[in-house]
């Protein structure tokens, strides 16, 4: 993965920039040497009926290599989120589910069943999940801890 070959992602949305939606990009931007292209366009809601909205979502999801699902959308936009994840699954796109931010809420089983991987809100965990699911890259890391023996 490089600037010339960024990972293509789609982050689930309900046609608005929620705090969680924006937080995903803060996390991705904080990681060095991680390049991505977002195919989601929550700020451009198409005109038309329910099918027009779904077709627009299909067009956003199709070029993506990985889907990042915000479980926080489920309660208010269950049908829309479920549609996005089912379409991703039918298109053989890996789904990375982010648990609810900051609250010890249970993730609904319906979402867990549609996810390939579930991660906490952690920059490293999110980027590693994207690398594993989208590009099948090895993401094993070792932290070096230095200490002095007295």
Go through the PLM ranges and name each one.
Residues 60-103:
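Conserved beta-strand-loop-alpha-helix hinge of the TIR/SEFIR fold
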Residues 113-129:
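Short, glycine-/small-residue-rich phosphate/pyrophosphate-handling segment
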């Amino acid at each position: 993965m490089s600037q010339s070959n960024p990972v293509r992602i789609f982050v689930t949305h309900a046609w608005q920039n929620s705090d969680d939606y924006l937080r995903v990009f803060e996390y991705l931007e904080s990681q060095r040497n991680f390049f991505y292209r977002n195919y989601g366009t929550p700020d451009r809601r198409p005109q038309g009926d329910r099918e027009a909205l779904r077709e627009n979502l299909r067009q956003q999801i199709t070029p993506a290599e990985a889907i990042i699902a915000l479980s926080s959308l489920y309660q208010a936009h269950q049908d829309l989120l479920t549609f996005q994840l089912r379409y991703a699954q039918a298109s053989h796109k890996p789904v990375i589910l982010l648990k609810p931010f900051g609250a010890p809420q249970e993730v609904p089983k319906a979402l867990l069943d549609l996810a390939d991987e579930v991660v906490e809100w952690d920059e490293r965990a999110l980027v590693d999940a994207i690398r594993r699911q989208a590009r099948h890259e090895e993401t094993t890391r070792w932290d070096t801890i230095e200490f002095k023996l007295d």
